[in-house]
Amino acid sequence: MKNKPLAFQIWVVISGILLAISILLLVLFSNTLRDFFTNETYTTIENEQHVLTEYRLPGSIERRYYSEEATAPTTVRSVQHVLLPENEEASSDKDLSILSSSFIHKVYKLADKQEAKKKRYSADVNGEKVFFVIKKGLSVNGQSAMMLSYALDSYRDDLAYTLFKQLLFIIAVVILLSWIPAIWLAKYLSRPLVSFEKHVKRISEQDWDDPVKVDRKDEIGKLGHTIEEMRQKLVQKDETERTLLQNISHDLKTPVMVIRGYTQSIKDGIFPKGDLENTVDVIECEALKLEKKIKDLLYLTKLDYLAKQKVQHDMFSIVEVTEEVIERLKWARKELSWEIDVEEDILMPGDPEQWNKLLENILENQIRYAETKIEISMKQDDRNIVITIKNDGPHIEDEMLSSLYEPFNKGKKGEFGIGLSIVKRILTLHKASISIENDKTGVTYRIAVPK
């Protein structure tokens, strides 16, 4: 059914609900309806009996008044009446062949026990249920008589059948008419969906300039807002990728141009740095820069892949990793002093190789901007391990603080890089956080790692 039009699906659902409710009501109220029709049968018998005994009482006892007779004094032909003498011995049983003598005998026995003037009864006669009312205390031509009024069960069945036909007709009409609200509801629901479909198709073709307009707050509205959110993120991602591509091209082009320029100079017998050795040193330095940038780009791609995978973290010593990185990098500026405050060995869950890269990127920044010293402290409490790294270099511009983690963000010294972007992604993989703040004497990096 899911391949059918929405209007048809809604109509089928509405019709199914209506039909199920109708069947359920018929099942639940079948006994109630049976009792109702039984009572209705007795009421009809009593009404007809009242009309007959009060206004048109026949003058002949033991005469049956058949409902089929055109001259019958009753108004409802399904009800039949018989005048009987109150004393069974006075009954001649004439003209009653259609009623069994055993039934007439039973009627007299019931009448003998009957204290009320009128009472309801039922019995099986010739395999068919009969509802009857006995009314005593009548007088016909000076003779005591009683009126036996009865109706067959088929009368009750006729009432039930008539009501059932009416219910079926009403249900059929309602189900057919439900097609109208189904079509209206389908159009009401599908109109925004069709619009969303067109927008999504255009977005799939990278035509995402036009916003998705949503003027409702229900589930369809939420879907529209989600599509608009997706469109905005795709636009932002597209712009980021273009900017990233431009920055990568610019960042890689500089060392390549230096290497090519110096290489061509050597071929021409010119040594820009005075001699061959110094000139080759420049080429080697630029090649190392180029290699590092390429490695960082590859590492950033690797982190993007790991972000989508479930990675198992092991316990390792963050103190040992930090000391190893410091030992490797501190020779870049021998004049800097290092102050390390670590109370004890600290174990934490994570990937040692990623933390090595993280600390390397942070400390390279510290070394680049520090004036005289770098301070490192590590502490832990019940919930977090806090790593604080501080340098006494110049403050970071306020407008730069919010964009430090963006790839190829241009630093104060005019350098592009992705070091802090790598730091941020590694911390995200470890559910850790970082804050970079200016203080009175320099810049402080504070990392909080949950245990």
From Swiss-Prot:
SMART domains named among the record's database cross-references: HAMP, HATPase_c, HisKA
Molecular function terms, GO-annotated: ATP binding; phosphorelay sensor kinase activity
Disulfide bonding pattern of the chain: none
Alphabetical UniProt keywords: ATP-binding, Cell membrane, Kinase, Membrane, Nucleotide-binding, Phosphoprotein, Transferase, Transmembrane, Transmembrane helix, Two-component regulatory system
EC number(s) stated in the UniProt entry for this protein: 2.7.13.3
Topological domains, Cytoplasmic: 1-9, 187-451
Record-given protein name: Sensor histidine kinase CssS
Organism: Bacillus subtilis (strain 168)
Gene (UniProt): cssS
